[in-house]
Amino acid sequence: MIELSRRRFLGAAGAGVVLPFVGRFLGPPAFPPERSFRIRAVTAGIPLSGDAGPRELEPALGFLRQARAELEAGGYEVQTVRLATQPLAEYLPDWSSREALEVIREMDEIALAADASLSLGPVITADEHVPEFASWAAELVRRTRNVSFSVRVASREHGIHRSALRSAAEAIAALGRESPGGEGNFRFAAAAFVPSGTPFFPSAWFSEPRTFSIGLESPVLLEEILSGVSGPAAARGALAAGLEAVLGDVERAAVEIGRETGWRFLGIDSSPAPGLDASIGRVIERLTGTPFGDPTTLAACALLTDVMKALTVTTCGYSGLMLPVLEDPVLAERAREGRYGVSDLLLYSSVCGTGLDVVPVPGDTPVDRIGGLVEDVAALALRYEKPLSARLLPMPGRKAGEVVRFDNPYLTDGVVMEAG
């Protein structure tokens, strides 16, 4: 088992520094012998009242302890447990005050003590520019270790939220400047059409009490399913059958946990979230027979997304394809080789998700440029009415083409990419 939780580490460690590029050896995955995937997250929904405090977190933390124990007893590796609230302003209307920040800090400490992480949901949900949001975001990251949050940048009712989008871009720039190595942006996203019940951070939020969802880390499973398979049609059929069987088992275990605890299971986010020993880039290259970024990459992304969307198990959240550049050694290496750029990631987002995820950009990228990238993500989400988000990482003092290395077991060496 991994003793230090993924989100706990991301919140507390690892500034990026420039070093000579060090390629990473992709050794055998450290998965339990009977499983070729991990449960990345069990996320519990805790809509809070205006008196947010310890007594409201404890029932959810107790549920997460039990859920984790039962899943582990069933042979599953549970990497993290998480709490997600409704949009912050619904329970802390004066969210930018020092008093509200102190409440959030206390909740962070309570969650941290239970080895859980906390998402505040979207802080800004309306289409409004909040000038103080950027400084508030930087202060929040300074005062907490495990708290994630987002801004809603598009909706069916109002289209692209260009004013809120400006607030998000200013926050991304501020976090890049004011958090060590720009690492504060790991905990923030500009999000569009991300539904309630999503287990993955930093965009997770919940609207219903006593509910939970599950997210997976499953590229190694996909590789196993594709072993010996040739051609798109055969790959599609093998993936569908293999995932239905495996995710069906997870669903049955989760439903049983819900029955025992009284917490309602919302579904599995079927997105095959990658890790350093579980590369989705490698899966795509197995499908195409060419390096990621070459022609047919888009077609492979579409195939994988189609399979995820067509599963008959109960799904939730993104349930598409994640391409987080700094969390996947193959994606990071192909970026270093110049095989794809930010515009290509936007193109791939038209057939998959989650948008622009963990993308390192120059530290001096102007706010307007950041906002333009976020607006492109919002436009795609609006056009296709699907969840997408932007988690951009301006690297302080770094320029495009420079290599960054993170002192962090969950991130790989990467190259700073041109911001569009």
List each language-model region with its residue ranges.
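Anaerobic metallocofactor- and corrinoid-dependent redox/one-carbon enzyme cores
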Residues: 31-420
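N-terminal secretory signal peptides and thylakoid transit peptides that target proteins
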Residues: 1-20
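C-terminal segment of N-terminal export signals and the immediately downstream linker at the start
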Residues: 2-4, 21-35
